């Protein structure tokens, strides 16, 4: 099938991982990786954030969610086209440019996408909107009271 074709194309230095890995196993791969390649385009794409949470730089196609989650030149690199040549150029740049990607800096950036931050920001947003709504109701009720007093 297609998996066999891809394995043959990839050669002996590439290992394909099947499904069913535990979170710990996946994190172990992220921790040992030199970089995480993300050549796809997704609206968000959680795997680049997961890799960064392990301090691993991400080499990603520069469209979709990767543009928001990967800081080009700081937490990884973005490439412009979904072509083998563009990906290869990105890998070459990563290998040869000599830029350090401090794992702590990468991990810190990944925290900006944490579940806790999402919960905190959603709660703050809802609290603000509720307060705005209450002010609008008060303004309406004052307006109605003033109108009734005039009649």
What are the residue ranges of the model-derived segments?
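Short alpha-helical donor nucleotide-sugar binding micro-motif in glycosyltransferases
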Residues: 28-33, 122
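Short hydrophobic beta-strand element within catalytic cores of glycosyltransferases
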Residues: 57-61, 70
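A charged, aromatic-enriched C-terminal amphipathic alpha-helix characteristic of glycosyltransferases
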Residues: 100-138
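Nucleotide-activated donor-binding/catalytic signature segment of Leloir-type glycosyltransferases, i.e.
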Residues: 3-20
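Acidic donor-binding loop of glycosyltransferase active sites
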Residues: 31-43, 56
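Short glycine/proline-enriched, acidic/aromatic patches that form the donor-sugar handling elements
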Residues: 24-26, 64-69
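Short glycine/serine-rich donor-binding loops of glycosyltransferases
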Residues: 45-49, 66
């Amino acid at each position: 099938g297609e998996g066999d074709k891809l394995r043959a194309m990839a050669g002996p230095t590439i290992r394909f991982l099947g499904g069913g890995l535990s979170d710990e196993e996946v994190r172990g791969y992220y921790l040992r990786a030199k970089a995480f390649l993300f050549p796809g385009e997704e609206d968000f794409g959680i795997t680049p954030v997961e890799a960064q949470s392990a301090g691993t730089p991400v080499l990603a196609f520069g469209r979709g969610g990767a543009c928001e989650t990967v800081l080009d030149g700081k937490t990884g690199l973005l490439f412009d086209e979904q072509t083998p040549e563009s990906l290869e150029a990105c890998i070459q740049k990563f290998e040869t440019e000599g830029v350090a990607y401090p794992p702590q800096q990468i991990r810190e950036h990944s925290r900006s996408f944490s579940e806790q931050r999402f919960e905190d920001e959603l709660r703050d947003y809802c609290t603000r909107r509720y307060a705005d709504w209450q002010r609008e109701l008060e303004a309406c009720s004052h307006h109605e009271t003033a109108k009734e007093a005039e009649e």
